[in-house]
Regions:
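Short clusters of small/polar residues that mark proteolytic maturation junctions
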Residues: 65, 122-124, 203, 237-238
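Juxtadomain coupling helices with adjacent low-complexity linkers
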Residues: 208, 214-217, 232-278
């Protein structure tokens, strides 16, 4: 509800009012889509799109790729916390959009939650294969058998890795039983660190031994960690259909693109240098 003007005779700027109404709607209902904002504000969708574009360009709101939702920007709210998922996704989304344009295959961004990796963003809607079964946001996948879980697990700190192992040892989820095999875990970490990326376990990629436990979705993936100030905060994958390319081919063609994207995301989360003179 707008208050009466304290400056009689001075006209308000209607365009600015519309912009502030939309900004307030996004702030009070983060995750609203265009349809929701249309219902909240009563503004025509064409007007809303122009306002939202302006707010986005001014770094006041941003749009999540996975579902088209609009959220208030976290930029300018002080130093980023390493556990701030919203700021992580905000930093990653434009980078993931550009990655998809370069490589044409989709990616997901995920971080650990309760011994699994939870998808928090995907550029699948921007890819040439939007039907590929990855994500959606909120989906949780295996820590030890997926490439994205392996990338996180193998590059995170020793204490965090031990905590993840303890969680998995108490789990009955398929694949988590490997957490009770120290030699298997040691081989996984050593191999992943040596090659510099996580690779999907064959059980998840058509190996007959996985039949009945892990439905074959016809795809494969590789992943790299996102490291901020020496700490792994998430992992980023690249996924494709196996009939289109081998792991060797994807690594040769696109691993450097994936690493560059992870580094760019990390750079956007690094604390600002507040140096100066005493």
């Amino acid at each position: 509800m707008r208050s009466a003007s304290s400056l009689p005779g001075v006209k308000s700027i209607r365009a600015l009012e519309r912009g502030l109404d939309v900004l307030q709607a996004v702030q009070t209902r983060p995750g609203a889509r265009l349809k929701d904002l249309h219902e909240i504000t009563g503004l025509p969708k064409a007007t809303l799109l122009r306002v939202l574009r302006t707010l986005t360009e001014r770094n006041l709101v941003w749009q999540r790729m996975a579902d088209g939702a609009y959220l208030p920007s976290s930029r300018g709210r002080g130093p980023a916390r390493l556990d701030d998922a919203g700021r992580l996704v905000e930093a990653a989304s434009p980078v993931m959009a550009r990655l998809c344009e370069r490589v044409n295959w989709p990616s997901v961004l995920a971080r650990p939650r309760d011994g699994r990796m939870e998808v928090i963003e995907t550029n699948r809607p921007r890819s040439h294969v939007p039907h590929l079964p990855i994500g959606p946001v909120g989906a949780r996948v295996s820590m030890l058998l997926t490439s994205i879980g392996r990338a996180y697990f193998s590059f995170c700190g020793h204490e965090e890795r031990e905590e993840i192992v303890r969680q998995l040892q108490a789990s009955a989820e398929p694949g988590d039983e490997f957490a009770r095999d120290p030699a298997w875990l040691a081989r996984l970490v050593a191999q992943t660190q040596a090659q510099g990326y996580g690779r999907r376990d064959p059980l998840y990629a058509g190996d007959p031994r996985g039949a009945g436990r892990f439905p074959d979705d016809g795809r494969d993936s590789i992943s790299v960690p996102i490291i901020v100030s020496g700490h792994v905060v998430a992992a980023l994958n690249l996924t494709w259909t196996r009939r289109a390319a081998s792991v060797t081919q994807i690594v040769a063609d696109h691993l450097s693109d994936l690493r560059a994207a992870a580094a760019e995301i990390a750079s956007g989360l690094e604390p600002a240098d507040e140096g100066g003179t005493a």
